[in-house]
Structure formats: C-alpha cells, structure tokens
C-alpha cells in the first residue's frame, strides 16, 4: 500500500510519507519532494479568507449560498428586503454569539477526551498558505543525506561526497574528522572521480548513480537510467578505475546491455549483476563474464524481486546478498509462472518506449503485470547459494520449512564462516521461522519459531534491520549473535540472540513503548546499540543507546520537549548525522558518539528560509490529544485556522489514511494540503490514528485483523460525533477524505455512518474490495479469502444505499494505477448504478498510476479536491438538479449598490 505519510508539527505545523547508495552526497539536497514542478491557479496574492470576529460572516468561503431563487420583482424591493434581512440577521447573530460564547466558556472536557498539549505559538498574522506553495514544495525543509562508507583499513567516519563547489573533484571520500570546527581542510579528501562527464570509447557518460568499491580503487557507474517499479530500475553499467580515471563496460561483450542490479563483492575483486533476469559474475582480473544462471526469463527471476516482493516484502530492488568474506552469494529464485496477470492500459503514453506495429497506432499500450490478488497463487521463492571459487549454485534443504506455496522469505543475513540467518513467514504472516544455514556443510536447522496468531492474534511486518554481532572474546562476546526486533509484552523491542542458535534472547529494551526500524547501528568496540524509539510518546521519535547486556539505556536527544528525530551512523557508529524533523523548524548536525558525552561537531542545516516563512505566514494551530474509544487510547491532532474564534461555527474536515501499522499523527514539521485547508480555506482539519495504526502497541495495532475497515470507521465516526458537539463546530458541514487506504476508509466511514455524521467525502484511488488487492499485503491483515470469507465480505464496500444518505461524495482514480487497480472504482460504481445512486462525482486521470502525476494531474487533483470541498461547504451539492451555485443575497446587494462592494 502506498502514501505512507505522516502529519504533525508545532503550533503551526503538520507533516508530510532510504537506503542510500553513494549516489547521494554529504550536503547534497535530499528534499523528499513529492510534488512535481508546475503552476497552479492560486498564488501568494490569493485573497485570504479570514475568520476574525470583526469581519462579516458572509465573506467566509465556507458559508452556504442560498438554495432558493430570488424573486423577479424590482431592484428596489430586492434591496429593501435584503437590508431588512441583514439587520435582522445581525441581531440574531449577536444573540447567537452571546449564547455560544457563554456555552464555550462553561463547557467541560469529555471524559473520553484527554488533551496532551496545545501548541499555541502559531503565526496568526501574515498571508495564508497557498496550494501552489504546497504542491511545488515551497514548505519542504531542506535536508541532506550522508553516504557513510567503511574505510578500507577500518577507518570510521568516512563519507562520500559529490560535486561540492568548494572542493575539487566530482566524487571524493572525506574524513568527517577533517571537517570539525570552522577550519575545514578542503584538500584532505581522496578524489575518486575528477570530472562529472566520463569518456568511454568516444562516448560521454553522465552517471546517474555511483558505487565505490570497498577498497576505493574502483567505482561502479550507472548511466541511461530507466525506472521500472517503485524501487527498481535498469541502466548501463561501467567499471571506473580511480588511478587511471578511465572506464570500461561492466560486460565488455555486451556494452549496451541493460543491467537490473550490480553489487560489489566485499573484497572488491568482483561484481555480481543481473541482466534479463539472469545472474552473472564479472571478476576484475578478467574481461569475461561468468553465467551463474541460464534459465531466467519472463516468469523466472534471479537476484531481483518480482512486483509483489518489491512492493510488499523487500521494499528494495535487490534480493542478492554477498557473504562477508566474498566467497558466497545468496540470492532468491522467484518463479511467478502460476501468478495471474493484470492488464494496465496506457491511453496517451507508451511507457515501453516502443513504436506500435503499423495499424495499431490507435490502440492503447497494455502492460501485463504478474499481480497475485488475495487468494490467488503467489510467486514461489527459494533461496539459492553460489560458491564463487567452485562456480557452483546449490540449495540447502532445511527441516520444518514452509511449503513452497506458503513461504515468504523476508530477510537474509550473513554471519561469519559461511553461516546465514534466514527469516521466513507463512503466507498469512502470523507464523515466523528463523533458520540457521551453514553453507560449508550445506546444512540448516530451525532455531526460532514464533506463533504470533496464538500470541496475540496479530501478524508480523517484514523488516530488514537485523544486525549481526560477531564474536569478540576479549570484549566479552564469546560467540556470534544477532540483534532482532521481537514482540515483548505487547510491544516491539530489541533482543540480542547469542549464540546464533539460541532461541532465548537478552532483552535490550522493555516497556510500554516501541523501537522503530531498529537497531540503527552497533558500536562493536564499545558494545553499544543505538536505536530510535517512541519512549516519550507514540507521536515522537528520540534516539537512544543501550549496552549489549541491556544496561544503561540513555537518550541521545533532548526528551524534555516534543521531538521527532532521525539518525544515520557512520560504519563504526562513532559519528552520526542527527536530523531534527520537528515540531519546530528542522535542522541537521553531525555528532560525535564515540565518547561518554554526545558532542556536536558541525551543524550542516538550519533551514533559515523556512524559519523566515514560518514567521510571515498565517499557519494553523495544532492541538494534540488522546481519544479513548472502547478502551483503546488513540492519537489525534486538530488543526485550527489562524485567528480561531471559539464563538464561531467552523466546518470540519477529517483527513485519514489509517492503514495497518501506519501513522499520520506525529510531531514532524510539515506544511501540506491539510495545512492549506486550515490556513487558506479556514476549515478545521482533524486527523485520528484509529485502531490498526502503528507505534501504540500491538493491542491497538492488531485489533483490526480479519475485519479491515470496521473498527477504524467506528473510531472515526465516534470521534466525529464528539467534534460535532463542540460549540465551535458546524455539525451540518463535516467531510472526510483520504487517498489509497484512506480512500477505502473514506467510503467505509460513509457506508457505516449512513449520512448521520458526515455529509461529504472525497475518496482517491480507493480499495473497494480486498479481493482485488495484492495477496501479500491483504492476507497479512485479512488471512486468505478461503480462511476468512465473512471478513472479506464485511470489508467490501457494498451498502451503497447507506452511501446514498450522504449529501455527496467524490471518487477519483488514476486510469493506469498498477497498485490499486481501477477495477476497484469501476466495480463499485456498477453497484451505485444498479441501485440508481447518483449523489457522487467521479474523475479519472489518464495514464496516471497510484500517485496521479501524469500530464499535470498532480496539480489538477489537488485543485479539484480543494474546489469540490469549497463547493460542498458552500451548499452547492444540495442543489442536485442545478449544481451551479446561485448568487447569495449579499452578492445581489453588492452588485445593486456599488457602495456595498467596497
């Protein structure tokens, strides 16, 4: 599932959803900009719809227009009655303000609602946030990524940089210690590539990606990049020699071949690569290439994942792993011959880049994707090994393995002396087996088994953060081991398993909080484990360290105030790039973690431009709260417009995603579409992380298993009813919207609510029947359709009669969505047609995938969402027969009496 974004910030902010090769340099911009450049109909000069008490209510954009036609009498009579109504309205308004103000003052908090904190420092003065700013990334923090690299002689703190203006050489390796303080030695680094343009056999190459060899004597270059799926791509690969500054094709016999993956050996003497779904080995001592496999093809993949493994299991382009000593290569063999195909049509573009045969120019291009839907055959995946010295491929049979049709391999980790740790789950992801394989003896055994279905009824998410801990008797580690994330008392925590076959770990962390993508790094010399966790709050992230025996847990970041941190460590964990991502304006710094005290060595980003914008724009105020529903404590943020007046009535928009393990309520700094709605349109925006979401423990997370949509919708509706009772909320103007899983949830809420609480909804790229979505994701949370037929039926959007009771809803889908297929929306619309349900609008974007970008679509869709929402809260959708908004009385008066226009 996509659109895994988060939402939060300080008083003025909310928030926006990598493995890094050395193509990204230290101090290189890494803006994570999800928006394409372009233009929008809104500008910074767009009139701000303020909500100050001194302004006339009729100027507010969300007030409904009249739904009755004005009489056809004389203009004078019209003006007279308009003035009478205005005077009467003013008297009534004064009375209402008095009563509501008193009510607001005397209101007591609901026992089910517990406010954590109110960020009250939002900027109320200044211009509103514009949609164009949001879509073009004007509010995105400037961020940098460091490509840490291990030194060939064990040096720590080395990093790769590209194209620094104050340093010579296109690509270089620097020691972070040479940059401490203000006196940076610009000549201290080692140049790997002198010039960006590389000449090879008379051809000029502009590398897209670069990967230095571990000994830093060679660089793997990639040019002619072509995107495949979310993480995968192809290109032409070259081996660049640092000493001579010359390059040659990775495979001299096929210089124009498109390579899908290439990886250096740890000993820097060979490259394993995949081309046309087969694996090859190029030893640098020879220009010839060795074929590791020969039968790869359309349905058989070696070393790279198919679509569903790339999307839902590995979240990477590689399923190939070198052993630490470079003697073996482990890789997956993926057979998807039994997986059914789904056709994705392109009506405008031709992504293949191929000209159609004569006579077929007017037919759409069709891409057939092997896409296993829930209940259909999965790809069969097996782990194979290649002995480099013997030039031999072999499997290792292990006892108690899952059957071929019930196996998902989620992680492969090399240990020492040819040993491998393999984690696998069953098809429904609720039984985990950990195997220890010895490639020298070609034997294996089961060393751990976790029956999660019986433990808490939940599931396990694929993760790839397990760390190998080599033996070091002189440092108190007599045996090899590894650190893994396990379930402990209902929360995700770090466990240290040693020796490798020991199923009983040393718990490094415990408590009612969770580690996140952990561990981040391990300092083997000092025996310290670094990790990020939610120890202070589910909405926060702080960096911690703990010793390998589980003692002396310490925070590296300031936990006395809300914070959302991320961190990347040098190879030896002696240095780190610390990124503060909110709630205030983000910053980044290099820190030294090698001593007992953490010291700041160099601040590399303060985002001064963003800090200036925060001071000059009218930003929403964010109120973070807890909501308790049916005994579950859930996280919520309410975004209030600038100049919020509790005596007024505001429309409310609920924005949600709510996919299993996801999070939208966090303390990141983000100015996004929700911020625009609150700042510019003057609406309140509420986001609730309902049951099923992540980082609040497994009780909250696993409650939705087998029945997606039911409890999440109940939580959203229950919370909306709480808000509808608030004195500052207009209960007649409440909407909900979401994208992807959020689109599914929007329809599920409208179905369950049946017009009682929400009048409007906007669903983008929604799943409408989980039998249409991919098997790996769906069955993890729903079991198979065979095992849970009633759950699938309950989760399907079927009660269209209930949706007809909403005032109106909007459906949007990309016509070439390869993730959530347009089949979902079309079959749902057929149900609407059968019962003559007409209270909806629909829009398709040609050739757009799940992100909806093709041909200006990304700007179009957000403008459409914004305008549709304005029309909804202005009452236009009440006029089903005539959806063109009529003039309000005030507009008629302004045209009749010029003085009123000013």
From Swiss-Prot:
| Sugar-modified residues | 335, 626, 794, 799
Reactions listed under catalytic activity: Release of an N-terminal dipeptide, Xaa-Yaa-|-Zaa-, from a polypeptide, preferentially when Yaa is Pro, provided Zaa is neither Pro nor hydroxyproline
Annotated disulfide bonds: none
Query: S-adenosyl-L-methionine: present as a keyword of the record?
Result: no
Q: Where is the active site?
A: 740 (charge relay system), 817 (charge relay system), 850 (charge relay system)
Q: How does it sit in the membrane?
A: Single-pass type II membrane protein
Q: Which parts of the sequence lie on the Cytoplasmic side of the lipid bilayer?
A: 1-78
Q: What is the name listed in the Swiss-Prot or TrEMBL entry for this protein?
A: Probable dipeptidyl-aminopeptidase B
Q: Provide Vacuolar-side residue ranges.
A: 100-902
Source species: Aspergillus oryzae (strain ATCC 42149 / RIB 40) (Yellow koji mold)
UniProt lists the gene as dapB
Q: Which GO terms describe its molecular function?
A: aminopeptidase activity; dipeptidyl-peptidase activity; serine-type peptidase activity
Q: Where is the composition biased (Low complexity)?
A: 7-21
Q: Which family does it belong to?
A: Belongs to the peptidase S9B family.
Pfam families named among the record's database cross-references: DPPIV_N, Peptidase_S9
One GO BP: proteolysis
Positions of region (Disordered): 1-23, 53-72
Checking InterPro entries in the record gives: AB_hydrolase_fold, Peptidase_S9_cat, Peptidase_S9B_N, Serine_Prot_S9B/DPPIV
Its subcellular locations are:
Vacuole membrane
